[in-house]
């Protein structure tokens, strides 16, 4: 990518960026096989053209709006300009200041705001922007706070700075304010280029105008290059737009000023109705307008590979800057992410307050049901064995309630790591470390009443070991859910997969079916069962050298080896979850 153009532009900013596409085309399908019928015959999926020979440009100190009817390719073009498309076949050229786009350099100077906001609902506006600044800037906390304060003033969010973001129907800031916060998250590193998908979508006319006016001020005062997609612009919003790229069926039918669009409609024989703005009418008749013809250009089918961008750039005589490093070390990232996660956990009722109450109340209720069962001679072993099986079922199955939180975190993680705000490793480490003390509190709230009320072995070492097992069970199940939340596409699929596996683990734990009765081809499930090892630990802790243990083929030495196996499950699921998340983020970033 070429060194920034230095030119006197509005607002005193010396560095400017111009984006340009030449004969840009984007196709999907064609090479992806699919089953064409019930017989399983393999056929090739039909290729679909999303963009065709798109040539347009976006200049500094201007708002360029990509418009067109639904399905015209607006979002696809914007994502390509942001370097976000990770699949499909792209040909043509994407130029930044006249040179082929270089991914790392371009990522450093640009900001991309998707249509869907991805914000933590329980953080305040100021906290959201502060954590974004701490993660993306090489600066001290004091300097980050000063920058965030200025940014909040610039965004007009002073009155809601200490208000929580909120989500959906929950109390929080308005839709327009939430949209400005999303824009602010991308502005903390002061990008020269801002790309926004549907900034006015879902907003009332006043909020939509407020957002677009804010963007216009940035072009005037700071000379930023702003590209946005828009679907239904009002008169006042249209006044803020400098250039329009009108698409129809993936082709450009107009690229220029609002006035030139008016002239094209006029010369095409159309009459703009009264009280209808020119762009709104142009979108309605886009299919009848003649596409702009451009000269053919040599295809660059390797779009999306930084190697190609770099080789093109170096061959053009440019100097490649290796500035794609992160702003913080892994340790610093873990500290910042851990602090943010801690606030989210303690403010999320279903994760902390509800979970703490659930553990305390469940411990008391179970203790009252199995009251002093440990002191009963007759059928005591059967009752205690059933008690151990039940509490493990309860503890392992109740962890699925954290799945929505993990899925929300994943969405934000993928968005933040796509801009290299931090490493995936730092997120996994912070998430793991934060849950260790939190689940310790939950385990003690559950274990303390239930252990003494049931009347299990009345010795301190027995209680401490029982509490340790409960704690590790919670950590193990939490890691299991975290791992599969990285894998599944949505909450419904996640619930189905996790519940199904938990049921299988319980079935093969050795409680319902003895190990020697399990078919050979299913024995691996016995050893993978999350129920097997804690169940054996609780039995050994209660009966120790009893003849009953020998009947169950259990040895007292397994008391600690089983804990080691459970710890390896925790590490294994976290490591597997890390690789799944890393691959997801890698695909998004590429």
Swiss-Prot record:
* UniProt GO molecular function: ABC-type transporter activity; ATP binding; ATP hydrolysis activity
Tell me which GO cellular component terms the UniProt record holds: membrane
Transmembrane region(s):
351-371, 387-407, 434-454, 468-488, 491-511, 563-583
InterPro entries for the chain: AAA+_ATPase, ABC2_TM, ABC_transporter-like_ATP-bd, ABC_transporter-like_CS, ABCG_transporters, P-loop_NTPase
Instruction: Please state every residue range assigned to the domain named ABC transporter.
Output: 19-274
Keyword annotations of the record: ATP-binding, Membrane, Nucleotide-binding, Transmembrane, Transmembrane helix, Transport
Name the domain of life this protein comes from: Eukaryota
Annotated ATP binding lies at 68-75
Q: Which Pfam families match?
A: ABC2_membrane, ABC_tran
Q: Where in the cell is it found?
A: Membrane
> What are the residue boundaries of the ABC transmembrane type-2 domain, all occurrences included?
332-543
User: What topology in the membrane does the UniProt record assign?
Assistant: Multi-pass membrane protein
- Into which family does the record put it? Belongs to the ABC transporter superfamily. ABCG family. Eye pigment precursor importer (TC 3.A.1.204) subfamily.
Q: What is this protein called?
A: ABC transporter G family member 10
């Amino acid at each position: 990518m070429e060194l920034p153009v230095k030119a006197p532009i509005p607002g005193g900013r010396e560095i400017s960026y111009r984006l340009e596409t030449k004969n840009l085309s984007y196709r999907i399908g064609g090479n992806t096989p699919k089953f064409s019928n019930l017989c399983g015959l393999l056929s090739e999926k039909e290729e679909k053209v999303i963009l065709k020979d798109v040539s347009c440009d976006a200049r500094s100190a201007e708002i360029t709006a990509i418009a067109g009817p639904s399905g015209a390719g607006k979002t696809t073009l914007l994502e390509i300009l942001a370097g976000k498309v990770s699949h499909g076949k792209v040909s043509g050229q994407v130029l930044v200041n006249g040179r082929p786009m270089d991914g790392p350099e371009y990522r450093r100077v640009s900001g991309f705001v998707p249509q869907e906001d991805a914000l933590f609902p329980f953080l305040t506006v100021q906290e959201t922007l502060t954590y974004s600044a701490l993660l993306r800037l090489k600066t001290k906390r004091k300097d980050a706070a000063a920058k965030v304060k200025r940014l909040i003033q610039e965004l007009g969010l002073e009155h809601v700075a200490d208000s929580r973001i909120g989500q959906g129907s929950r109390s929080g800031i308005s839709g327009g304010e939430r949209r400005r916060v999303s824009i602010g998250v991308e502005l903390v590193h002061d990008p020269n280029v801002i790309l926004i998908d549907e900034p006015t979508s879902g907003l009332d006319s006043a909020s939509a105008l407020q957002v677009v006016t804010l963007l216009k001020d940035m072009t005037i005062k700071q000379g930023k290059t702003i590209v946005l997609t828009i679907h239904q612009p009002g008169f006042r919003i249209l006044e803020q737009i400098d250039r329009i790229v009108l698409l129809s069926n993936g082709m450009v039918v107009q690229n220029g000023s609002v006035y030139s669009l008016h002239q094209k409609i006029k010369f095409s024989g159309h009459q703009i109705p009264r009280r209808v703005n020119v762009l709104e009418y142009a979108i309605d008749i886009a299919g009848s307008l003649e596409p702009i013809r451009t000269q053919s250009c040599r295809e660059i089918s390797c779009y999306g590979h930084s190697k190609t961008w770099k080789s093109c750039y170096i061959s053009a005589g440019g100097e490649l800057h290796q500035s794609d490093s992160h702003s913080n070390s892994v340790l610093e990232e873990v500290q910042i992410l851990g602090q943010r996660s801690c606030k989210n956990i303690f403010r999320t009722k279903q994760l902390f307050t509800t979970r703490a109450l659930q553990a305390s109340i469940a411990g008391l209720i179970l203790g009252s049901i199995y009251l002093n069962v440990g002191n009963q001679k007759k059928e005591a072993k059967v009752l205690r064995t059933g008690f151990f099986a039940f509490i493990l079922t309860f503890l392992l199955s109740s962890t699925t309630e954290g799945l929505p939180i993990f899925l929300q975190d994943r969405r934000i993680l993928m968005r933040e790591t796509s801009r290299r705000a931090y490493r995936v490793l730092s997120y996994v480490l912070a998430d793991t470390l934060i849950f260790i003390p939190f689940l310790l509190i939950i385990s003690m709230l559950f274990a303390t009443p239930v252990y003494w009320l049931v009347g299990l072995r009345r010795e301190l070492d027995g209680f401490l070991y029982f509490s340790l097992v409960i704690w590790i069970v919670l950590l193990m199940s939490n890691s299991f859910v975290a791992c599969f939340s990285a894998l599944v596409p949505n909450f419904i699929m996640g619930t189905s997969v996790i519940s199904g596996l938990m049921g299988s683990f319980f079935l093969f734990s050795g409680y319902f079916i003895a190990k020697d009765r399990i078919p050979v081809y299913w024995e691996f499930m016995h050893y993978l069962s999350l129920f097997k090892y804690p169940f054996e630990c609780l039995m050994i802790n209660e009966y120790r050298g009893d003849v009953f243990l020998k009947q169950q083929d259990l040895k007292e030495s397994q008391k600690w080896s089983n804990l080691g196996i459970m710890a390896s499950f925790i590490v294994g699921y976290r490591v597997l979850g890390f690789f799944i998340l890393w691959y997801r983020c890698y695909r998004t970033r590429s």
